[in-house]
Amino acid sequence: MEEKERPFPEKRKVLARAMTLKNYVGLGLGSIIGVGWVVVAGDWLTRGGPLGAILGFFLGGLMLTVIGLSYAELTPAIPVAGGEVAFAYKAFGPGLSFLTSWFLTFAYISLCPFEAVAIGWLIEYLFPGLKSESLYTVGGYSVSFLSIVAGVALSLFIIILNYRGVKNSARFQTAATILIFVCVAAFVSIALLRGNFANMQPLFAGSGTGIAVLGSIIAILGIVPFFYSGFDTIPQGAEESAKRLNPKDLGKAVIASLIIAAVFYALVILALSICMQWQKTITYEMPTATAFQAAFGYTWATKLVLLAALFGLITSFNGFFIAATRVLFATGRAGLLSGWFGDVSEKFQTPKNAILFVGSITLIGPFIGRSSLLPIVNVASLAFISGWLIT
């Protein structure tokens, strides 16, 4: 095949090579964690009970590791931007590669305004004194001045950070992910020292019979893939690995992200379950944040959890922004979309037009508000599943 006919030719515009193994683990892990462990942990306990939720997340992580092994094999073999787009082309040709690129581009891009909206909601919860009056209502949800300012400010920060070079973005992602684990380690330690394992009873949701136990685990398995999504951001940035990095380390980063995330979720569920009776914990709006204050009177622990959640939201935002721009860039460079998306900044060696395009769409999110969250989740989930099924 002639080079001009190949969507991934050897002579092509390339991105800066600056990411280390630590950066890739930070990219995958930071994208996985997000804020679900704070916002919907009560739902995990409701569905499975403490042990049911822990087993569900471990088994789910184990099953996704099988998919991760495929990524671990393909990413070093085809270390170019776009991940699944390149994988699909190598296996099926430009037709299915084009479909894959559309599904994944749509999925990743839709998640960026989701994060921009969520940041305003979280900041209002973290600093209730800053909460402002509603400016207008969209879909039954109010949109405040604070939520708009917070969403726009974070979006601009992510856009500028990524435009000015992947090295800065990767360093920030790694540092923020480490801070999340420091915060989480603190409140897990408190729970282990002050909590009571008797609070975990009953261990499973339902009657406790064999069928109920199995049902508890299956109920968690049904939602696990959503909370592990993010490890697939690593292949999107494979082209930007530092020259000294062994390509096989990219595969190690994928597997490491999944394993560490499984341990993270298990510890969070355990800590939440032993600090007080979990049947009472699930009645709180943000159980992971409020349970520690209710159980031990530690207001600072609540703030610590919310601070970790704030960093989690930012790392998932940054990770999905990187993935969205790399898929769009790779598709444009391949000629499957306008070549405009494949342009690279001469100064920073970043996909400048892809960044500006995704950034522009992201900036719309804060003005729509929380009414957009559920539709975004539904559409993004369908797009991700469609893209993954092809590859």
For each of these PLM feature ranges, what is it?
Residues 57-59, 127-166, 181-187, 354-361:
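Transmembrane alpha-helical segments of multi-pass small-molecule transport proteins
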